Amino acid sequence: MESNTNSQGQGIIPQSYHSSIFFSISKGSDKIGGLLEYLEIIKKHNINITRIESRPSKTEKKDYDFFLDLEYPTENNKEVEKVIKDLEEKGVKATTLQESSNQTYAPWFPRKISDLDLFANKVLEMGSDLTSDHPGASDPVYRERRREIAKIASTYKHGDEIPRIDYTEEEIKTWGVVYNRLKELFPTNACHQHAYIFPLLEQNCGYSPDNIPQLQDISNFLQECTGWRIRPVQGLLSARDFLNGLAFRVFHATQYIRHPSVPLYTPEPDCCHELLGHVPLLADPDFADFSQEIGLASIGASDEDIQLLSTCYWFTVEFGLCKEGDTIRAYGAGILSSTGEMEHFLTDKAKKLPFNPFDACNTEYPITTFQPLYYVAESFQKAKEQMRQFADSFKKPFSIRYNPYTQSIEILDNKDKLLNICNDIRNQSEILADAISKLKA
């Protein structure tokens, strides 16, 4: 999973921390003069402002709302607290979101899909960093190739065309070995959603034993199916950053491939895992909603809750099983991309329990051996409802919703925003009622 930490400390990029401050200025006041005064307060505390946005407020007072993104080099939030205090002394009520273990604040999170650019390159492990026990650790050609592909991913920004990789003959051969072996097992081991979508990927995205599909083609296909998109990444992201991406229906995927010496094994996610394991299910509407539900639960969650969510992700999206009549099939990418795991989960050695996030979140799991325990979902729809109930147990100072039109996270912190949701529900209900009446006619 994309949440592993780097115990060797390799490839870790220097960390910076973020806050977002929200405040309003009265329409009748000197907007420009007032804003400059408040910016000077922030500057005084040696905090960088990375973005400023303004818009007419939706409150009855018709104020101007300002949104400031801040960046600072230390996790210590004392200076941010001083900024809030100084603003309050000026009669300005400011709200902040920031990366902090202080429970007074909610951790910072991306508000727009383009905000994913802020952390996309802050990987825990670079794609070019290989531990001594990695199959390609002593292969200089392979290591250089990993560095090359990681560098390509590092240049990507939201809205760009995903760079296409010119895969070598050896890389395509490795892909083909994995592809052919897994495809033999899919009919008897994979869930019916995977079985339905995989041929569509072959038809629309160039999936075949002789071709490694390009992320841009896959992303285009997913956007048409479920609104999901793929974003290239250099290596392993933190659990928080990876899960936050899911809230925007964005899946961070690697483009490099495992070492050819052991084509049926990889110690970390590679393009075989991402494209053969994860991608097919992201084209299924119910699974797409379920995955986003996990992402939305991570928005503003505490470090402790992020760990619980990561574990639930492991037992669902990575190693989840589901019921299909009297049989049990796999939907987790860690199973669907591993020949050994696909054969193992059907044996008596593997214990299977009904999926319950309140139980799964506290279950330990191995990362280097076959899973001794799997959780079985009744359906993706029910699993989504269970995850929503689980997320409701998290203590957050606000509620949120994802706006698919603006691809942004909205904080539901005033009456007008709630009324907007009510209007949306009413409009959708009217459309539904009209459709039902025409079906009955």
From Swiss-Prot:
State how activity varies with temperature.
Answer: Optimum temperature is 40 degrees Celsius (in vitro, with the purified enzyme).
Q: Name all ACT domain ranges.
A: 23-102
Which terms under GO biological process does the entry name?
asexual reproduction; L-phenylalanine biosynthetic process; L-phenylalanine catabolic process; tyrosine biosynthetic process
> Mind listing the UniProt keywords for this protein, alphabetically?
Iron, Metal-binding, Monooxygenase, Oxidoreductase, Phenylalanine catabolism
Pathway involvement?
Amino-acid degradation; L-phenylalanine degradation; acetoacetate and fumarate from L-phenylalanine: step 1/6
Q: What's this protein's name? A: Phenylalanine-4-hydroxylase
- The residues the record assigns to binding Fe cation are 273, 278, 318
What is the protein's species of origin? Dictyostelium discoideum (Social amoeba)
Q: What else is known?
A: This enzyme uses tetrahydrodictyopterin (DH4), a D-threo isomer of biopterin, and not tetrahydrobiopterin (TH4) for it's catalytic activity.
Similarity section: Belongs to the biopterin-dependent aromatic amino acid hydroxylase family.
Describe its assembly: Homotetramer.
